[in-house]
């Protein structure tokens, strides 16, 4: 039997009640897929809200709790990064427009719970790109 890409992650997100019947091998695949997709903590949140955490094997629960701690760290780090971004944008009189993950966190959207991301997506008018790059450089960011 061929397992579709991210089958276990999709199952956990769409039908979380099904994961309680997973064996340890399936849990291992779910954890690997979820970590790669940055949604393991999100799955933990879903399992908690569905009152299914008590049915999760302790080996998997440790991984979920670790992912939740890391996601909380990412969200705290975002606050610090946003302060610098806001200073940069204020210095040139442009609004700071966030997209995707960071926007969900700032908006306190439920979608942000357990979400992990490695960058901050911004919307900048093309005409202002050079100006924004200079302001970000002054605040300590360097072009990658």
Q: What residue ranges belong to the model's regions?
A:
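Helical scaffold of the NTase/Pol beta-like nucleotidyltransferase catalytic core
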Residues: 3-5, 13-100
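Generic alpha-helical propensity signal that fires on short helical segments
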Residues: 40, 48, 57, 112-116, ...
């Amino acid at each position: 039997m061929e397992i579709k890409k991210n089958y276990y992650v999709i199952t956990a997100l769409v039908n979380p009640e099904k994961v309680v019947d997973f064996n340890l091998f399936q849990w291992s695949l779910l954890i690997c897929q979820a970590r790669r997709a940055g949604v393991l903590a999100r799955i933990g949140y879903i399992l908690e809200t569905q009152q299914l955490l008590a049915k999760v094997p302790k080996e998997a629960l440790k991984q979920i709790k670790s992912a939740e701690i890391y996601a909380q760290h990412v969200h705290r780090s975002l606050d610090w990064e946003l302060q610098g971004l806001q200073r940069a944008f204020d210095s040139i009189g442009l609004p700071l427009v966030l997209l995707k993950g960071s926007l969900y966190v700032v908006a306190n959207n439920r979608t942000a719970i357990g979400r992990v991301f490695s960058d901050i997506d911004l919307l900048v008018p093309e005409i202002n790109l050079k100006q924004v790059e200079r302001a970000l450089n002054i605040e300590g960011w360097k072009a990658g």
